[in-house]
Amino acid sequence: MLRFLNQCSHGRGAWLLMAFTALALELTALWFQHVMLLKPCVLCIYERCALFGVLGAALIGAIAPKTPLRYVAMVIWLYSAFRGVQLTYEHTMLQLYPSPFATCDFMARFPEWLPLDKWVPQVFVASGDCAERQWEFLGLEMPQWLLGIFIAYLIVAVLVVISQPFKAKKRDLFGR
């Protein structure tokens, strides 16, 4: 399996598949926000940023999968997936165990050099409450679904990093 993951990390297909899944999740989030009129909270916005990190890592990996740039993509992927797990876990705990003393911020705090909420307010402005349960599917809230998704991204990222020393088998069709 590790050889297979190593082989996949050297090709564009797996990176583009990861980019497609992250983009599909981002578009789904925008659909929930603008069509279903659900209000994203600050943690939702941060989770969205972590997902953009996974998307960016996938695009970097797809650009040059056979060069050392692939390792940069893996580091960004690991960091974004890890932060996504942290954020969605915190968000899940806020929803499962609401407390007046444990709340999220009123607005997202982006660095001064990257004010995403000012540049693209349709995507990055938070207007909801983190503890409010707005949507449920199969008994799970949205942060719980995202927690599973980010855990999957993180597990695959760790396996891909571990697989890097394992070289792919050369398959010779006629056994020479």
From Swiss-Prot:
One of its GO terms (cellular component) is plasma membrane. It is found in: Cell inner membrane. Keywords: Cell inner membrane, Cell membrane, Chaperone, Disulfide bond, Electron transport, Membrane, Oxidoreductase, Redox-active center, Transmembrane, Transmembrane helix, Transport. Gene3D superfamilies: DsbB-like. One of its GO terms (molecular function) is protein-disulfide reductase activity. It is a multi-pass membrane protein. Residues 1-14, 66-71, 164-176 are cytoplasmic. Residues 32-49, 90-144 are periplasmic. It comes from the Bacteria. It holds the Pfam family DsbB. Its main location: membrane. GO terms for biological process: protein folding. Disulfide bonds join 41-44, 104-130. The chain crosses the membrane at residues 15-31, 50-65, 72-89, 145-163. PANTHER family: DISULFIDE BOND FORMATION PROTEIN B (PTHR36570:SF2). Required for disulfide bond formation in some periplasmic proteins. Acts by oxidizing the DsbA protein. Belongs to the DsbB family. This is Disulfide bond formation protein B. It comes from Escherichia coli O6:K15:H31 (strain 536 / UPEC).
